[in-house]
Amino acid sequence: MTNKYESPLSARYASEYMLRLFSADMRIQTWRKLWVSLAKAEMELGLPISAAQVAELEAHIQDIDYACAAQREKEVRHDVMAHVYAYGKAAPCAAGIIHLGATSCYVTDNADIILYRDGLKYLRKELLKVVANLAEFADRHKSMPTLGYTHYQPAQLVTVGKRATLWMQDFLSDLEELDFVIGSMKFLGCRGTTGTEASFLELFGGDTQKIDRMNRMIAVDFAFTQCYPVCGQTYPRKLDSRILNVLSSIAQSCYRMANDIRLLQHDRQIEEPFEKNQIGSSAMAYKRNPMRCERICSLARYLMADALNAPMTASAQWLERTLDDSANRRITMPEGFLCADAILRLSQNVTNGLHVNEKIVEKTVREYLPFIATENLMLEGVKRGGNRQELHEIVRICSMNATAKMKNGEQWDLLADLSSHPEFGMTNAEMEAVLEPTAYIGRCPEQVDSFLARIRHQISDITKSDTEIDL
């Protein structure tokens, strides 16, 4: 324990990759790489910058003197200029050409775009691992009948695997949205204080082609093919809103799946992984709580709420820019990524070890199958000469009686009750023969096969993570 607050997202939940991605080292090193790229482009386009100066900048990307920068920031109250100063101390021969023609958002905004792009690509892989786990689970249980629920009340039969495809479909919708966001991300480039590139017109003597080439060169250095065609000082904050929206969408899908598993674990039909020495309760030693799924839901609520921040920030960007986005974005954006990372890692763990208690599932099906089969029994009775309306009334009365006995904890036998009515023209044994669960699952196995065939190419190159989350 320490005497300083530490975010649970970094202390307990997020991966090492995501923590490194949003670390101060990664952020400031990215700033320095952007300064190097700018200097290199300016040199190649004829500005008085030497190869030795560029080489010196490249040699000092990683040796960041945070104490020097912090002291300077206290004096000038400007974080970017504090790091320009610290970088200049590390590379004194190049100190005079660092940040030439640029404004703060050249490094802050472009670095954010780079980190967000890389973070989204990482989350894409994590999302696909969840889908791959569910695909395997769905295929394994595609023909296993289970009780379906509408309004959380017993309905018709589905299969365990078919239900998993509903979760998968949500995740694949998220994947489509995620791919769109990644594919549409653009670089800000180096555009000046209000996006007019006036400083570069001055530097390049009015040569607009050199300005365009400079921006293309810098964008390519960071694997971007496009810059925003127009901008103010910042990149459009609508991008932040898009990003957090898709992270929120992933959280919604994880929440829905985890909540379903929690409901099913209550009935002991399906259970999340439970370790041999895991303790469910400090007082109730027998407990097997769905703590992983509960944690998914808990973190998902936070992420869905976090996503509400970005639209307010995007809508409050005055004219060419205002700074009231800065402090907010420093918190909401990294924590959104860390939270999505944590949720997906938990979801991987759950889906990789999801356990079906087949005997419980079968018992639940047997308990409710007589009710489910009543329509088929009624149709068979009509085939044998019965009156459909009379049979319907008999089914209604017998079903209500059986339900009342269930609620009172009494023994009940719906089929025996129905077969005692000669209007059906069926014996109890003949009615029992109708109770084959697979006759009531419709096209579930076929639907699972068809669905998996359609998405197989999307998950074919995904390999399981070699480091599972330690819970």
Each language-model region and where it sits:
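A short, charged helix-loop
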Residues: 213-233
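Alpha-helical transition-metal enzyme core signature, strongest for iron centers
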Residues: 77-80, 127, 131-134, 164-178, ...
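Short beta-alpha connecting loops at secondary-structure transitions
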Residues: 19-23, 68-70, 278-298, 320-335, ...
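Long, amphipathic alpha-helical stalk/connector segments used for oligomerization, subunit docking
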Residues: 302-388, 394
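Glycine-rich anion/phosphate-binding loop at the beta-strand->alpha-helix junction
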Residues: 174, 232-326, 330
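A helix-coil-helix interface module used to build multimeric assemblies
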Residues: 1-201, 206-217, 280-281, 291-295, ...
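C-terminal alpha-helical interaction appendages
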Residues: 353-421, 441, 446, 453, ...
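Glycine-rich cofactor-pocket loops
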Residues: 139-161, 271-287, 320-327, 352-372
